[in-house]
Amino acid sequence: MRISPSEAAMKLSLSPPPYADAPVVVLISGLGGSGSYWLPQLAVLVQEYQVVCYDQRGTGNNPDTLAEDYSIAQMAAELHQALVAAGIERYAVVGHALGALVGMQLALDYPASVTVLVSVNGWLRINAHTRRCFQVREQLLHSGGAQAWVEAQPLFLYPADWMAARAPRLEAEDALALAHFQGKNNLLRRLNALKRADFSHHADRIRCPVQIICASDDLLVPTACSSELHAALPDSQKMVMRYGGHACNVTDPETFNALLLNGLASLLHHREAAL
């Protein structure tokens, strides 16, 4: 992977195109903001696509102090600007949770650029259950700091049996997350942007084909959210994984990758046929 040479835009990590004019797929992670979230997908995606990963502004290798009114629209705009600066004007988007919200905003604001959208455990507007989960996590952050936030995070991401079988891995992930913690203020401003986002009155304007992937055992985002999203979009298909939790692409990459690869191939072909 190489780093985009643009100094004005966010740093992007781009894989070499596997062939001339290969489609571009942009991977957008959730609230954690790290491009490394998609490691279980990279090896299969780079065989067919030029893949773009990045750490979101205010996280990882794109450090910044975010404004109090930071928004999903700003996240979409700065990503699109970075892609254009890297010479990428048309791209498919795969977004997880917050990343799916950014993907929808991109599809609304830059319809000529977004060819296909894949929403993974996303939603139209935050569900009361999801809001409750984040309220608990915020209380942990305020009372116990970054360590409490990080240690509680796997409970919302992974199935219990998956975690129980991987205690050493989770300890290592906790240590890494603490070492690269985005900071309390940035985290809360990104979380507030997520909570304010509401696509319930705009989703019908998204014209690109959308693949919706959700997990039936997601503790953080009920599958009803994906059903509502599916009903609101003009052109979408929904796939439900029986197992995997909120981070189903990490816990069951074999099932997830098959759904993703088939969906991208089908929807990109569908898009080309419609042009």
UniProtKB/Swiss-Prot annotation:
It catalyses: carbamate + 2 H(+) = NH4(+) + CO2. One of its GO terms (biological process) is nitrogen utilization. The keyword Plastid does not apply. InterPro entries: AB_hydrolase_1, AB_hydrolase_fold, AB_hydrolase_sf, Pyrimidine_utilisation_RutD. The keyword Cell membrane does not apply. SUPFAM superfamilies: alpha/beta-Hydrolases. One of its GO terms (molecular function) is hydrolase activity, acting on carbon-nitrogen (but not peptide) bonds, in linear amides. Its EC number is 3.5.1.-. Gene3D superfamilies: alpha/beta hydrolase. Keywords: Hydrolase. Pfam families: Abhydrolase_1. HAMAP family: RutD. Belongs to the AB hydrolase superfamily. Hydrolase RutD family. Involved in pyrimidine catabolism. May facilitate the hydrolysis of carbamate, a reaction that can also occur spontaneously. This is Putative carbamate hydrolase RutD. It comes from Escherichia coli (strain UTI89 / UPEC).
